[in-house]
């Protein structure tokens, strides 16, 4: 059996989920339903946003159905994002103006935002196995 050694970066920063991750059947079914209902939305595992070597890490539970699931950026497009990005700006963790869309030019400074579960769950409630699978 051939073993592949992981680089130091791979052990510190886990890889992002593939666009068509199929590890959680309930989330795959919900994502498929959303893709049919909203074909113009992101509807995929939402990648982390920001600096991998950040001093501040913000971890949400999961993408919101009409927020990050729609836009493809954590906490973007919903009221929680309005509050979070205003707070990050106030304390100097961002540059640019948050406009609730991923192409607004906003950049994080020494901060990173991610979710415990990368795919949007039904009723915004992931189950324990989904959290563990998405590590």
Where are these regions (language model features)?
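A polyanion-binding, active-site-adjacent surface
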Residues: 8-135
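Residue-level detector of intrinsically disordered terminal segments
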Residues: 1-5
């Amino acid at each position: 059996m051939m073993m592949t050694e992981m680089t130091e970066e791979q052990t510190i920063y886990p890889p992002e989920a593939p666009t068509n991750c199929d590890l959680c059947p309930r989330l795959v079914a919900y994502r498929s339903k959303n893709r049919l209902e909203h074909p113009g939305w992101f509807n995929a595992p939402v990648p982390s946003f920001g600096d991998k070597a950040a001093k501040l890490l913000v971890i949400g539970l999961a993408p919101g159905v009409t927020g990050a699931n729609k836009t493809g950026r954590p906490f973007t497009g919903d009221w929680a994002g309005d509050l979070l990005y205003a707070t990050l700006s106030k304390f100097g963790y961002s540059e640019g103006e948050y406009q609730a869309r991923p192409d607004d030019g906003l950049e994080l400074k020494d901060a990173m935002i991610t979710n415990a579960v990368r795919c949007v769950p039904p009723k915004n409630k992931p189950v324990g196995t989904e959290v563990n699978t998405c590590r």
